[in-house]
Amino acid sequence: MIIPIRCFTCGAVVADKWEPFSNRVMGGEDPEKVLTELGVNRYCCRRMLLSHVNIIREIIHYTRPI
């Protein structure tokens, strides 16, 4: 789906780090190194980015018209 704006646990903003994280990991960089360089140090925030699955393109086909 869409990346949450804030971490569910601590409330820190994580959405602004999604694009750089995603681009760098898709480019072949190590996710641990990327998160550290982006300043995501808490493990609760790290899991928000690591466990996110972008499935909005698949789900949009199953919505009903309003």
Swiss-Prot record:
GO terms for molecular function: DNA binding; DNA-directed RNA polymerase activity; zinc ion binding. GO terms for cellular component: cytoplasm; DNA-directed RNA polymerase complex. Its EC number is 2.7.7.6. PANTHER family: DNA-DIRECTED RNA POLYMERASES I, II, AND III SUBUNIT RPABC5, DNA-DIRECTED RNA POLYMERASES I, II, AND III SUBUNIT RPABC5 FAMILY MEMBER. Belongs to the archaeal Rpo10/eukaryotic RPB10 RNA polymerase subunit family. Its main location: cytoplasm. NCBIfam families: PRK04016.1. The keyword Transcription applies. It is an enzyme of class 2 (transferase). DNA-dependent RNA polymerase (RNAP) catalyzes the transcription of DNA into RNA using the four ribonucleoside triphosphates as substrates. One of its GO terms (biological process) is DNA-templated transcription. Its cofactor is Zn(2+). SUPFAM superfamilies: RNA polymerase subunit RPB10. The keyword Coiled coil does not apply. Pfam families: RNA_pol_N. It is found in: Cytoplasm. It comes from Sulfolobus acidocaldarius (strain ATCC 33909 / DSM 639 / JCM 8929 / NBRC 15157 / NCIMB 11770). This is DNA-directed RNA polymerase subunit Rpo10. Binds 1 zinc ion. Zn(2+) binds at C7, C10, C44, C45. Keywords: Cytoplasm, DNA-directed RNA polymerase, Metal-binding, Nucleotidyltransferase, Transcription, Transferase, Zinc. It catalyses: RNA(n) + a ribonucleoside 5'-triphosphate = RNA(n+1) + diphosphate. Part of the 13-subunit RNA polymerase complex.
